[in-house]
Amino acid sequence: MLEVEAPLEIVQESSRKLLGLTNLSEAIKPIIEAENPNPNSLCLLNHKETLSHIIPGSLGLPNFKKVETLNFQMVKEYPLLTGYPLLKQKDIGINTTGVLLKQLMVNKSSCYQDGISTISVPVHMPVHPMVMPTKVSSGSLVTKLTLLFPPMFRQGILLFKKLSLLGFRLVRFCLKAIMLKAQEGLLLIAGQVHVLNHVDPIIVH
């Protein structure tokens, strides 16, 4: 059998059709890129290498011992977020760490399961301006009356002596008026004690 060598142009044309290439430069482009790589692609490769040499547990810092030829112009610095410590109150000098922790515990205890927090506020009962709360009991009221009676008795005795000099009828009239006033005062005191302490009224004989 005779072997016929095909021309070079026909072989190249057929190979381009098989590879789906329309231009000779497209077929030679991968070879040129392999011999002369693009500097941008090298930067990307260096960046990938730095990511591959990150030490676990070092907060994302690269290991400069393994990678010595880094392109520092392409590397960006990202500062880590720092937690600010609890500060002291100004012009006091007292550390408020304990107070803040107590507030956090109170807020945590007053939270529901769905994340809604509640604030416990003491309920103040409305007080009417005319009705003032008093803590006067019947015993303390009696002691106050017993302290007031001796000077009243002294004044009454002096008045009785003066009236006795004027006549018996006038003395009897004044004593009757004094007894009526005393009964009226006792009835008023009994009503006030009953309203304040809700006890049975004092029976005056």
From Swiss-Prot:
A GO CC annotation given for this chain: virion component
Keywords associated with the record: Virion
Cited InterPro entries: Corona_nucI, N2-like_embe-CoV
Pfam families: Corona_I (PF03187)
Coiled coil: none
Compartment list: Virion
Function comment: Structural protein that is not essential for the viral replication either in tissue culture or in its natural host.
Family: Belongs to the coronavirus I protein family.
Note: The gene encoding this protein is included within the N gene (alternative ORF). Isolate N2 belongs to genotype B.
Name of the protein this chain belongs to: Protein I
Organism: Human coronavirus HKU1 (isolate N2)
Organism taxonomic ancestry: Viruses, Riboviria, Orthornavirae, Pisuviricota, Pisoniviricetes
